[in-house]
Design a protein with these regions (language model features):
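Conserved PLP-enzyme active-site core in the AAT-like
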Residues: 7, 18, 23-33, 39-255
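General small-molecule cofactor/ligand-binding pocket signal
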Residues: 14, 60-62, 369
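Short glycine-rich or small-residue beta-strand-to-loop segments that form or flank ligand, phosphate
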Residues: 14-16, 106-109, 376-381
Length: 570
């Protein structure tokens, strides 16, 4: 652990053998007590909500941005300003004493699922004097310390003012993108003004750790640290970034080649990469010019992080005004866009929903990390060879060939057709894409999703109280179409997009009716297109008398809801 702390730039490091879900809970239990206020990235992992429930904390949410393509963006800098935080606290019904309160901890997911990396120095500086501790949940970002691309963009990176800055935690799923065994995780600590008493921290650590740990996991964490020490870590990450950049450039080149050479207009389509089309470069004389990304040397793209920084109000990212150097797009996290929607969120007349492509890839052994309605994420990791990225390109070409030739679905998805012969037995790939795209277009899915996250639900009770109601049987399963004015007892997370639409203790209200609309849409979609269902956390699926899927979720029983009158009941 001491060696790992040195390698990862921490004061102290702790090895954890039950994943970063447990690491997050350890951090919470080390510094948060019942009634403490915590600032929470709404784009958080479910383990953060579990931690809030376990500690009895009061969550105040930081809202991430979102573009018209449905991609989850960063929390804008002003969300971290004291004036904005104070406004949210004053409007929260869960904070009874608006004058005397403590904000113990702020939690930020870094990087986002689509590879947006924060300038952590800017966040730490803004939270100076506001919170005691900052936790960067970097489950998918443990490699950042080992390449200049990410300097200043991970929790342990910036040098902080030890007398004024908050103490910083980062949690890493070392098993995800480094070389540890499954469930291997690390907690890194960099002390600020309110230093961690490591004797007390150890009590929280032992609360969640087994007295009979799997020592192979611990050994693998040690090996992972050793692998990244010295120049080897830089070499491994450099190689990964190189492969990702080459893939990005190939995809762009292929798109242009198909557009130029394909005679049949209907076949002039390819997948787009979510990235800037051009980058502003500066020569030795200080002269600036715009270059197409596919024309820039890979070495330059690796050596200049500023080329990957999002500029304010640029059309390609769609997140509005961003401060210079605040957000960097991680080259190794590649978001692929399928045809069907413009950058402004306008649905085209034809398209190929991403779930069709990702199901095709999955059946051929290619793992897609995350899928939206018209996008999916490909993750380049250590050891990814040219052969593997070449296989991905080959399978995308195979899909295009099958689509252009309008192949029968039986040739594309034989298992799905076998399971649902009445639905798909005589259908072709183009017909499936047309039906699904038209359904999404008529549902105005891009607009609905944007509205879902534009208005935060009303907080009615503490998440810990909502969970107690669940345990005590004071809840009931409610059909999603009947959710109006009900208080949720669970966190509901639809995939796509992967952000909770409602948290435990929040109420479904007329102001947030789009949430219910989206859940109803998802239920209907799953019944219309079996085999391509959405993934839903927090919902229970039942079959009705017609063998149709019906969504239910746990809400506080109405008889108990009527008793909710005072702060003491929260």
């Amino acid at each position: 652990e001491k060696f790992a702390a040195k390698i990862f730039g921490a004061d102290e490091t702790y090895f954890v053998t039950n994943g970063t879900s447990t690491s997050n809970k350890i951090v919470f239990h080390s510094c948060v007590t019942p009634g403490d206020i915590v600032l929470i990235d709404r784009n958080c992992h479910k383990s953060i909500m579990h931690s809030i429930i376990m500690t009895g904390a009061i969550p105040i949410y930081l809202t991430p941005s979102r573009n018209s393509l449905g991609i989850i963006g960063p929390i804008h800098e002003e969300e971290f300003d004291w004036a904005e935080i104070e406004k949210k606290i004053n409007s929260s019904s869960l904070v009874s004493d608006k004058e005397n309160f403590r904000i113990k901890l702020a939690v930020v997911t870094n990087s986002t699922y689509d590879g947006l990396c924060y300038n952590t120095r800017k966040i730490i500086d803004r939270l100076e004097g506001v919170v005691d501790y900052v936790l960067f949940d970097e489950a998918w970002y443990a490699y950042a310390n080992f390449h200049p691309m990410y300097v200043g963009r991970y929790g342990m990176s910036p040098e902080i003012d030890r007398e004024r800055a908050p103490t910083v935690f980062t949690t890493h799923s070392t098993h995800k993108l480094l070389a540890a065994f499954s469930q291997g995780s690390m907690i890194h600590v960099k002390d600020g003004k309110k230093k961690i008493d490591h004797g007390r921290f150890n009590e929280a650590y032992m609360m969640h750790m087994s007295t009979s740990p799997q020592y192979a996991i611990i050994a693998s964490l040690d090996v992972s640290s050793k692998m990244m020490a010295g120049n080897s870590g830089r070499f491994l990450i450099d190689e990964t970034i190189q492969e990702a950049i080459v893939f990005r450039k190939k995809m762009k080149h292929l798109s242009e080649e198909i557009e130029d050479k394909e005679v049949d207009r209907k076949r002039r389509w390819w997948f787009e990469i979510w990235q800037p089309a051009q980058i502003t470069m500066e020569n030795e004389k200080g002269e600036r010019k715009r270059e197409d990304i596919e024309d820039i040397d890979e070495q330059l793209l690796k050596e200049h992080p500023e080329y990957w920084c999002l500029k304010g109000n640029e059309d390609w990212h769609g997140f509005g005004k961003l401060e210079s150097d605040y957000i960097l797009l991680d080259p190794i996290k590649v978001t692929v866009m399928t045809p069907g929607i413009t950058k402004q969120g306008r649905m085209r007349n034809w398209g190929i929903p991403a779930t069709i492509v990702t199901t095709f890839l999955r059946d051929r052994g290619i793992v897609v990390e995350k899928s939206g309605h018209y996008s999916f994420l490909i993750l380049f990791s250590l050891g990814l060879t040219k052969g593997k990225s070449g296989t991905l390109l080959a399978e995308l070409f195979t899909f295009k060939k099958l689509f252009d030739e309008n192949a029968p679905l039986d040739d594309v998805f034989p298992d799905i057709v076998k399971k649902h012969p009445k639905k798909y037995g005589r259908m072709t790939l183009q017909e499936l894409s047309e039906q699904m795209h038209e359904y999404l277009r008529k549902a105005r899915i891009a607009r609905v999703l944007k509205d879902v996250y534009s208005q935060a639900p009303e907080q009615v009770m503490l998440p810990a109280r909502a969970y107690s109601e669940l345990v005590n049987g004071n809840t009931e399963l409610v059909r999603i179409r009947e959710l109006q004015n009900r208080i949720s007892a669970v966190m509901v997370v639809p995939y796509p997009p992967g952000i909770p639409v409602i948290m435990p203790g929040e109420r479904y209200t007329p102001e947030t009716k789009r949430i219910i609309e989206y859940l109803n849409f998802s239920e209907d979609f799953d019944n219309r297109f079996p085999g391509f269902e959405n993934e839903m956390h927090g919902l229970k699926v039942k079959l009705d008398s017609n063998n149709k899927k019906r969504y239910y979720t746990y809400c506080r029983s109405e008889e108990h809801t009527s008793e909710l009158q005072s702060r003491s009941d929260l």
